[in-house]
């Protein structure tokens, strides 16, 4: 269990025993939001060379900030809740002490001693077979944290009668310790509260937030490691090829009963048809551009493949299989969690998988001009210093996204998008932007995965084409 969480538990016990509020000042939120996000919409769309009507309808190689605010102010729970709390996004997790069972036993006993019913302990650990050697350590955050859905009070105890010791705003994050039963709030139909912790002026603070006002987020390291094992098993037989149909260069596959999406959630555009038999009259599903495949055999213009992460085997027309730019060695993996809006980056160092970076990310959302970031196992296909994007519904270049690595169709992992400024009819580059407040909150891109620009730059330099895979989990 993290030393930080153990300290917070003992501080909580002392405060409950004394029945006094902690002598803390209200926590001031560092609510610096990126100027680009406050004053303009981010429009991200890769420039498409082929601007035929079909391409514009089918391609969706697009990135644009949707029309909703991530930091919309909600009414506080109490009239006096006007102060905000200090930004805790950079709280680091370093000291590990004990395991999950020890953590639950200690917290459960101490909470019970004070009349609190423990529902759940949050104590995510790095899997034992993974070492940690961070090569990028900015914006570190607790492995378990809350994303606030509304403005909320932080209270001394899980009751509305308890002292308010701080406030936190919507779309901010807070390290998470446990879930307990507290006051039942009729309007929400809920009696669940989250115990949170933070560091203020070198002192560990702890308090409670009503659960309906927040969403639990976690780093699913266990699931990330399992996905690496799946990929390793597929790569054990030799290099992995990938599906190649960027911008439908090899032809758009047929529709499925008149539909452009299959039952697995993959789209027709920039995919290949995966047939059950080596003929075009056979039933098929879509396999997206960039998806890694194991080549099994060839027959009559078809290639039989085992798609990494898919059940069964499929026949794909030869023209959609790229074996020249293959995953020759599996040494580096970027894993994005679509559910939690975060990611982990792993490298094989001296035969040992090592976590070298973890942090927040933003994935795509379905919309008129946008798509969810597709699940699956992909090739890191190419790197670009930047790519240009259109304003939605036009062929007007709106800006660029820096330090981009393409993994599927028009989907890249990249830094914060930059909108050009227009002066005297000319595009002016205002310079790269490091930070975007919405990163790691809700899905809002058009398929791409947004990172803080310094992390995108790190990945761009670190990733080797032919040795790096890109995985999207949920």
PLM features: what roles do these ranges have?
Residues 318-428:
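Gly/Pro-biased beta-strand-loop elements
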Residues 157-173, 276-289:
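SH3/SH3-like (including bacterial SH3b) beta-barrel domains
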């Amino acid at each position: 269990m993290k030393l930080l969480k153990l300290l917070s538990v003992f501080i909580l016990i002392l405060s409950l025993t004394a029945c006094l509020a902690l002598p803390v000042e209200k926590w001031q939120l560092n609510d610096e939001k990126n100027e680009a996000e406050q004053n303009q919409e981010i429009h991200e769309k890769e420039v498409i060379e082929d601007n035929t009507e079909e391409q514009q309808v089918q391609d969706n190689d697009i990135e644009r900030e949707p029309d909703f605010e991530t930091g919309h102010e909600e009414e506080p729970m109490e009239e006096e809740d006007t102060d905000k709390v200090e930004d805790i996004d950079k709280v680091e997790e370093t000291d590990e002490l004990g395991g999950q069972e020890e953590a639950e036993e200690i917290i459960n006993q101490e909470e019970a001693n004070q009349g609190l019913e423990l529902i759940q302990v949050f104590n995510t650990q790095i899997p034992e077979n993974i070492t940690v050697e961070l090569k990028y350590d900015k914006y570190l955050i607790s492995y378990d944290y809350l994303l606030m859905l509304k403005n909320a009070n932080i209270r001394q105890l899980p009751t509305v009668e308890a002292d308010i010791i701080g406030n936190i705003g919507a779309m901010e994050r807070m390290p998470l310790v446990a879930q307990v039963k507290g006051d039942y709030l009729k309007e929400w139909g809920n009696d669940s509260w989250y115990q949170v912790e933070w560091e203020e002026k070198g002192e560990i603070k702890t308090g409670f937030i009503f659960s309906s006002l927040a969403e639990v987020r976690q780093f699913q390291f266990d699931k990330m490691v399992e996905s690496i094992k799946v990929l390793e098993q597929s790569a054990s037989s030799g290099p992995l090829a990938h599906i190649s149909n960027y911008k439908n260069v090899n032809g758009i596959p047929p529709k499925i009963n008149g539909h452009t999406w299959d039952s697995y959630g993959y789209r027709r555009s920039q995919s290949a048809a995966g047939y059950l038999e080596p003929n075009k009259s056979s039933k098929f599903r879509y396999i997206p551009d960039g998806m890694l495949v194991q080549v099994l055999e060839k027959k009559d213009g078809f290639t039989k493949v085992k798609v990494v992460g898919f059940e069964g085997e499929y026949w794909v027309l030869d023209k959609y299989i790229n074996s020249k730019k293959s995953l020759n060695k599996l040494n580096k993996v970027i894993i994005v969690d679509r559910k939690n809006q975060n990611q982990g980056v792993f490298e094989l160092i001296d035969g040992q998988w090592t976590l070298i970076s973890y942090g927040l990310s933003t994935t795509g959302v379905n919309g008129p001009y946008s798509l969810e970031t597709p699940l699956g196992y992909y090739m890191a296909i190419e790197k670009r210093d930047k790519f240009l994007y259109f304003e939605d519904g036009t062929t007007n270049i709106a800006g660029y996204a820096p330090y981009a690595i393409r993994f599927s169709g028009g989907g890249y992992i990249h830094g914060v998008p930059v909108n050009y400024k227009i002066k005297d009819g000319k595009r002016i580059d205002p310079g790269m932007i490091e930070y975007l407040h919405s990163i790691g909150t809700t899905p809002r891109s058009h398929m791409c995965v947004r990172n803080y620009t310094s992390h995108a730059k790190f990945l761009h330099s670190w990733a080797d084409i032919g040795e790096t895979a890109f995985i999207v989990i949920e």
